[in-house]
């Protein structure tokens, strides 16, 4: 994309993309954290009412959350705590960049709905770490590769409320 390789926590192919992603190096991780922070700061400077950070649906941050797509053996892979590290570091940099008085929403999939992906218990644990980093959480379900609808108009209203109510209980955030 844009003449650059797709980045991912590990070189694990996706059925959606036809290219093998490049495993992120320590330098990539550092740069991407700063890119998120810079983008959030620009949103604030340009008059946005808040910023949303997408940790759902098989996008980059959610790839780190899943043992299926995150097969790293360093501090960003393996244990649940390590898989949470990069998304939490991104959110910490975003919060630092925009300040406490600017709303930050985090979008998560309450479950990846993938055989070897993450489940609700994982996301309850992740959401419990968002206090001070986020002001609210938007909850959906699944990834684009999951066998459930992902397009909003294909999903009945309230379909993921069972996931969001559990996330709210563990995070204390709306």
Task: List where the protein language model places each region.
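Flavin-dependent oxidoreductase catalytic cores
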Residues: 1-174
């Amino acid at each position: 994309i844009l003449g650059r390789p797709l980045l991912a926590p590990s070189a694990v192919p996706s059925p959606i993309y036809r290219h093998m992603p490049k495993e992120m190096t320590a330098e990539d991780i550092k740069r991407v954290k700063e890119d998120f922070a810079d983008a959030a700061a620009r949103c604030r400077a340009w008059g946005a009412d808040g910023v949303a950070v997408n940790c759902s649906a098989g996008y980059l941050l959610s790839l780190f959350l899943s043992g299926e797509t995150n097969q790293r053996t360093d501090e960003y892979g393996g244990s649940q705590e390590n898989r949470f590290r990069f998304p939490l570091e991104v959110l910490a940099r975003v919060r630092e960049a925009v300040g406490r008085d600017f709303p930050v929403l985090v979008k998560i999939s309450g479950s990846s709905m993938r055989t070897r992906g993450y489940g609700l218990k994982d996301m309850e644990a992740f959401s419990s770490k968002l206090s001070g980093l986020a002001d609210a959480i938007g909850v959906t379900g699944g990834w684009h590769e999951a066998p459930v609808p992902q397009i909003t108009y294909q999903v009945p209203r309230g379909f993921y409320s069972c996931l969001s109510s559990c996330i709210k209980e563990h995070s204390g955030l709306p």
